[in-house]
Design a protein with these regions (language model features):
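Gly/Pro-rich active-site capping loops and adjacent beta-alpha segments
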Residues: 1-6, 148-207
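Short, compositionally biased leader-like segments
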Residues: 26-59, 108-116, 254-266
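N-terminal leader/propeptide and maturation segments of large enzyme subunits in energy/redox metabolism
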Residues: 35-44, 183-262
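A short, hydrophobic, proline-anchored segment that marks a local hinge/packing element in signaling
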Residues: 136-144, 154
Length: 287
């Protein structure tokens, strides 16, 4: 039979009438900020954060232009702490998610003071990027009252064209990074809510091998910005509902729980040396 789940806040008084409809009264309780993780709250907040990252992905897919993003779903979305550490991600592309934290941290290092309404673009493989076609958009989330940087949202999408010596920007015989396409180290696309699309177009058109599909690049980057902004909006709503202290506390609990699970997984692997051989299309072994 179909099954649904209903979340009822801890302090809410509930009762059911003769038609089995729930009546709700009272004011929801705000979880306390403390150093002890509550397993129930941990699960609830983990799913709250994950749902925000997933909604970012839905926004990106629906607003993107290219087949690569809209249909192949070659993108990833995640939420980060104010220092660039990964909190939670949607179940997207693992190779993106494993490196995005380094990208966010490099942006923070380049721009010590990120202003509200700013948005940054990068695809630098030496700074957490996968390869040049994977373009990352980083958006800060500031506290509405203090203006303090409290979170960051980020999305990474594979652009089917970013320049280079061959269409598709994945040449197998490139001799340097320039032959693979346009390098974007750290470009401020939006400053205080004002977009610099002209500067982005100029950047994508620079160099001996510029992008062949600048309009598609700009459209998909706009979709990534929209995805990040949806995450910003939902995170602010979460803070308004539970308070910043509680949200930060639950983020810390999630990170500690993840670290503990990883330690337990590593302990479960017996000591020893492990070898694995895989093969290329022509049968050449990779050891």
């Amino acid at each position: 039979l179909p099954r649904g789940e209903i979340l009822i806040e801890a302090s809410e008084v509930t009762d059911s009438d003769r038609d089995a409809e729930f009546c709700r009264e009272g004011r929801p309780i705000v979880p306390a900020e403390n150093d002890t993780a509550n397993p129930i709250l941990l699960e609830i907040f983990n799913n709250l954060f994950a749902s925000i990252a997933e909604q970012m992905g839905v926004t990106l897919q629906k607003t993107s232009l290219s087949t690569n993003v809209k249909e192949r779903l070659d993108f990833s979305c995640a939420i980060f702490t104010s220092t660039g550490d990964l909190v939670v991600n949607a179940p997207h592309i693992p190779v993106h998610l494993g490196a995005m934290s380094e990208t966010v941290k490099h942006i923070l290092a380049d721009v010590p003071v990120i202003g509200p309404g700013d948005v940054y673009v990068t695809n630098d493989p030496f700074r957490g990027g996968s390869h040049l076609p994977d373009v990352t958009i980083v958006t800060p989330v500031h506290d509405a009252e203090s203006g303090e940087l409290i979170f960051l949202t980020a999305s990474r999408a594979h652009h089917s064209e970013i320049g280079g010596i061959v269409p598709g920007s994945m040449p197998p015989f490139s001799r340097n990074l320039g032959e693979e396409g346009v390098l974007i180290r750290c470009f401020r696309l939006v400053e205080n809510g004002r977009s610099n699309e002209t500067g982005l177009r100029e950047l994508l058109g620079e160099g001996p091998w510029p992008s062949r599909s600048i309009n598609d690049n700009v459209a998909d980057i706009a979709a990534q910005v929209a995805a990040n902004n949806s995450g910003v909006k939902l995170l602010r709503e979460l803070v308004e509902r539970y308070s910043l202290a509680v949200v930060h506390s639950q983020m810390n609990h999630i990170q500690r729980a993840a670290a503990e699970k990883m330690r337990l997984a590593l302990k479960a692997i017996p000591d020893g040396q492990y070898e694995r051989t895989d093969f290329l299309d022509d049968g050449s072994p990779i050891r």
